[in-house]
Design a protein with these regions (language model features):
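RNA pseudouridine synthases
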Residues: 1-184
Length: 184
């Protein structure tokens, strides 16, 4: 039987599990084929690329840190992020006694054609926001949020835009598509 691999654009507020919890929608309402499970997690307040598959060995491979699968994020942060802060992110940050691995990070322009988040992030006219693109090869709980906060720029909106060689592209929130297992 052929392995099924799905790329899903997880909307804000949706859990990365099939069992709903009070106040949060889960994956069970998006019409996925039977037998698929999330290969990783994305917090309910984060958006973007989430892989699902029916192959347990593939899930294990995607989650095992020794394989260092890159994951790329766009983070909208509070304030105008500085190059020094980005350089700190690149070198790694100490969070609760753990030193993160070096990552790729760069300041980027606000993304064009980005869907609106529902609900929108807070808006304060006198405090700007900025965007940073980060590629990590590890995935600790809320790592990007902890990293940006540690350098003085808390994350307001977080979107995973790529997992390994699989970009989210123009896939809209709540939509999914089958991807080729060999590109992982």
């Amino acid at each position: 039987m052929k392995t099924v691999v799905i790329l899903f654009n997880k909307p804000y507020g949706v859990l990365s599990q099939f069992t709903p919890e009070v106040g949060h929608q889960a994956l069970d309402g998006f019409g996925f084929p039977a037998g698929v499970y999330a290969a990783g997690r994305l917090d309910h307040d984060s958006e973007g690329a989430l892989l699902l598959t029916d192959e347990g060995k593939l899930i294990k491979k995607l989650l095992d840190p020794k394989f260092e699968h890159p994951r790329t994020y766009l983070a909208q942060v509070d304030g105008q992020i500085t190059q020094e802060a980005v350089n700190q992110l690149k070198r790694g940050i100490t969070i609760k006694g753990y030193r993160t691995k070096p990552c790729q990070a760069k300041i980027v322009s606000p993304p064009e054609n980005l869907w609106e988040r529902v609900p929108p992030i807070r808006f304060r006219a006198n405090i700007p926001t900025s965007w940073v693109n980060l590629t990590l090869i590890e995935g600790k709980n809320r790592q990007v949020r902890h990293m940006t906060a540690a350098v003085g720029f808390p994350t307001l909106r977080l979107i995973r835009i790529q997992i390994g060689n699989i970009p989210l592209g123009d896939l809209l929130p709540g939509k999914w598509r089958i991807v080729n297992e060999r590109v992982i």
